[in-house]
From Swiss-Prot:
GO cellular component, one term: bacterial nucleoid
Listed name of the protein: DNA repair protein RecO
Organism: Xylella fastidiosa (strain Temecula1 / ATCC 700964)
Keywords: DNA damage, DNA recombination, DNA repair
Pfam families: RecO_C, RecO_N
Source organism phylogeny: Bacteria, Pseudomonadati, Pseudomonadota, Gammaproteobacteria, Lysobacterales
The organism's place on the tree of life at top rank: Bacteria
Family of this protein: Belongs to the RecO family.
């Protein structure tokens, strides 16, 4: 299959054999693709190598044969966000999530748009934690494993003042005992879950609970094997708060 002048975001790049690269991209029309960029070493290929960087928005042409395609041409369409600190780690995170959870060639039209929006939020450092929660929700919904965030597993409307455990398969479950501090730590309020359902940033400090709740759900769908970016973010935060 010939793919011509398709736009995409570069997710990941790694060496492939001696002089080539394996480039993972996210497209609107074809989903996630793995493309082999051959012979990219040397001065004449500097422009191409510069375009094949994570977060870069590109236009490319390729020949798709089987699992991996052959990249024929690529050019940068803008300047990729220059990130540092937590925003840089957040970009690693969203890219790793896509690589681990979204299979190649799966239709992800809405997720492509969500990625574009999240990329711009990273550029402006706009409500970083909230932006990541929205993107996580978009991934779950795209994969068909999302859940109703307006009602609990029994169909009862969420109580904004109550706390809920996010079950990966059934959705919110009301926390029945406030005495289990360990379980309570990994819960989110009905208020913040309803805000997530309506994609309206909440006026609350409960985003940490939402982060832990969503991580538990994602870990289930990751088969119990965590992300390298989670480890990097934890190490960064520890270093950042150390004297």
């Amino acid at each position: 299959m010939l793919i011509e002048h398709e736009v995409a975001f570069v997710l990941h790049v790694r060496p492939w054999r001696e002089t080539s690269l394996l480039v993972e991209v996210l497209t609107q029309a074809y989903g996630r693709l793995g493309l082999i960029a051959r012979g990219v070493q040397g001065l004449k290929k500097q422009t191409l190598r510069a375009a094949l960087q994570p977060l870069q928005w590109i236009r490319f042409s390729a020949i798709q044969r089987g699992e991996l395609g052959q990249l024929r041409q690529a050019e940068a369409l803008d300047t990729a966000p220059r990130l540092k600190g937590e925003t840089m780690l957040a970009s690693f995170y969203i890219n790793e999530l896509l690589l681990r959870l979204v299979p190649r060639h799966a239709p992800v039209n809405e997720l492509y748009l969500a990625y574009s929006q999240t990329r711009e939020r990273l550029r402006t450092n706009d409500s970083l934690a909230w932006s990541l929660r929205l993107f996580e929700l978009d991934i779950l919904e795209t994969l068909g494993v999302g859940f109703n965030l307006e009602c609990d597993a029994n169909g009862t409307p969420l109580d904004p003042a109550a706390r809920y455990v996010l079950d990966p398969l059934e959705g919110p479950r009301l926390l029945l005992s406030e005495h289990n501090n360990a379980e309570r730590r990994d819960t989110a309020t009905g208020h913040v879950l309803l805000a997530l359902a309506h994609k309206q940033i909440p006026n609350t400090n409960d985003l940490a609970g939402l982060r832990r709740s969503m991580r538990a759900v994602l870990l289930h769908h990751l088969g119990g094997r965590g992300l390298k970016s989670w480890e990097m973010i934890a190490a960064f935060r520890h270093q950042d708060t150390s004297p």
